[in-house]
């Protein structure tokens, strides 16, 4: 048994909220012989042109969730990594588009009246802007007993692909925001298509795969959620307590997707933060994850909050994922990573504005060179065995 102490480190980030600026548009869509879709429209002072490629590989071969037509969903997923677009394009009937256009714009069918022009349904463009500061936390594990790397069953081979597999669980507060499992799955799929776009900025060829989603309700929520809920108001969690409980829960319940996956993420619509003496909670934390926890059954957990309707936490999920892949915050040294010999990120100041820093233009949707080096280092270690797969297997 490995015993450890977890140190919690915080970094200020910003969240995004709808600005109130919206516009109704009729996008044009053209499909080339190669299958690339070009979407064009003008809205909110932006001339948008996207070159979208199929991204159905985001869903694993055996993606699992109840009451969802997975193959139909797979055909609808498109992305433009250059512009950060992650969209569901439905051509069964009048064409509809929903999802992330770029860092500032979201698109969805305009349901009020179902206006149709030249066979195209009207769409609503919503602008999101950076808002109040929140915090990210990472649990750095100081192990008292070193792991034996010789016990790793499979090492990476030259022709392997790097594929990070995710199992997503949602708490009842997040689940009840959606009318159906299908609507929830659409939202989560767009979210992780956006994560793939951000992972591409590492230039390490890392693929993102969703193995499945379990949408908990009030009756089915596991003990690590129920037992650690602070009643508030509002209902909330203490992040370091929750990540410890979640990690222990899945350490003791290594079955099915929880066993097979590389990372397990809880998405919650409840807040996270520090309890006050009066019983309320200072909501200040967007996400938390275990440092370098990938492939470790008892440490491969991460948590992200999302109480929006417009997929504004894609960057949080990418940020927490990279903590799990061995990167600290920019500006932090190797002592903030649970990987012996890690180069750390002290040479990349947080003020440079990358995803693992304080997120400012022009770098706020990219990872720093230090983050890349840290992830590369973890990928070189035997303990990262689980994310290497034969390319024909996915």
UniProtKB/Swiss-Prot annotation:
Its main location: secreted. This is Venom metalloproteinase antarease-like TtrivMP_A. GO terms for cellular component: extracellular region. Residues 1-16 form the signal peptide. GO terms for molecular function: metal ion binding; metalloendopeptidase activity; toxin activity. Binds 1 zinc ion per subunit. Expressed by the venom gland. GO terms for biological process: membrane protein ectodomain proteolysis. It comes from Tityus trivittatus (Argentinean scorpion). Inhibited by EDTA. Residues 162-390 form the Peptidase M12B domain. Zn(2+) binds at residues 319, 323, 329. It is found in: Secreted. Belongs to the venom metalloproteinase (M12B) family.
